[in-house]
């Protein structure tokens, strides 16, 4: 069925464009939906996304479109590549058209008011849809430039996982499957917060030992928090956990890392986000994550420290000093070691 129908990609940003190219390379007809008619026309005529993925050719099998209802009606497989703040606004008006469709979320964010992940919001909007999550260490430009990449498709629906693997798997892109949709999606959302701190540390010239400490303790915090919410902690040792955390916290191509780097150079938060020109989900996630951690009583000193830097006037040096002088804790305390 999918081979005879266009595949829809909702969102014309850098990742949506890179994902559309992957699908087109594998011989699929792709409808790349975006709200901005001028952007759609620019891609249609120039065969490039000049705003978000300049210099990367948009393949002929991709049709930029702006009619959302027609796009979702014509497709059985729909990749949702929208900013978290826009997801409800975009999908709610076409909810009646989504029954039975395969909806795959790629957005790594958390809704502020409800603390819902994106696939949970999609499930609320389209309760009869088949839902999955695509996540992992997937920098859009590297995918577009054919760097060897692996990702995870997570869903309780095995047939959906197999369908996504079939359409995306190629010579430079490998897709693994997981049944832990919640854990995979949570890992993708949480790591954005720590990438901001990693970017700041790099900007301030902190050493490799420091960067390694931040990444490792970030993994401990993420996993501790996820386990408290009922996710499988072992998921965080895979591509969607430590894999995504490493690439996001070490690459200047990461949007959240770029925001942190700009903050380390002395820019205000608003200036750093404006310089980026795209959405950095980590800023929004940080606010809700700190509140949720306090509500649940989960120990997350890096989250509290970054919140103090961004919103309470503290410096990174002050936060790191507080971390270093705090009471010593157990290293790996989020996975039971009984039986080892």
From Swiss-Prot:
- Listed Gene3D superfamilies: N-(1-d-carboxylethyl)-l-norvaline Dehydrogenase, domain 2, NAD(P)-binding Rossmann-like Domain
Location of the active site: 191 (proton acceptor)
- List the catalysed reactions: sn-glycerol 3-phosphate + NAD(+) = dihydroxyacetone phosphate + NADH + H(+); sn-glycerol 3-phosphate + NADP(+) = dihydroxyacetone phosphate + NADPH + H(+)
For whether the record's keyword set contains Nuclease, the answer is no
Q: Does the keyword NAD apply?
A: yes
Gene Ontology cellular-component terms for this entry are:
cytosol
Q: Which residues bind NADPH?
A: 14-15, 35, 108, 140, 255, 279, 281
**MF terms (GO), sorted A to Z:** glycerol-3-phosphate dehydrogenase [NAD(P)+] activity; NAD binding
User: What Pfam families does this protein map onto?
Assistant: NAD_Gly3P_dh_C, NAD_Gly3P_dh_N
Q: Which domain of life is it from?
A: Bacteria
Q: What is its main location?
A: cytoplasm
Subcellular localization: Cytoplasm
Where along the chain is sn-glycerol 3-phosphate bound?
A: 108, 136, 191, 244, 254-256
Q: Which SUPFAM superfamilies match?
A: 6-phosphogluconate dehydrogenase C-terminal domain-like (SSF48179), NAD(P)-binding Rossmann-fold domains (SSF51735)
EC annotation from Swiss-Prot or TrEMBL: 1.1.1.94
Which keywords appear in this protein's UniProt record, sorted alphabetically? Cytoplasm, Lipid biosynthesis, Lipid metabolism, NAD, NADP, Nucleotide-binding, Oxidoreductase, Phospholipid biosynthesis, Phospholipid metabolism
* Uppermost EC category: oxidoreductase
Give the residue range of the signal peptide. Answer: none
Q: What task does this protein carry out?
A: Catalyzes the reduction of the glycolytic intermediate dihydroxyacetone phosphate (DHAP) to sn-glycerol 3-phosphate (G3P), the key precursor for phospholipid synthesis.
Q: Which family does it belong to?
A: Belongs to the NAD-dependent glycerol-3-phosphate dehydrogenase family.
Name-wise, this protein is Glycerol-3-phosphate dehydrogenase [NAD(P)+]
Species whose genome carries this gene: Azotobacter vinelandii (strain DJ / ATCC BAA-1303)
The lineage is: Bacteria, Pseudomonadati, Pseudomonadota, Gammaproteobacteria, Pseudomonadales
Q: Which gene encodes it?
A: gpsA
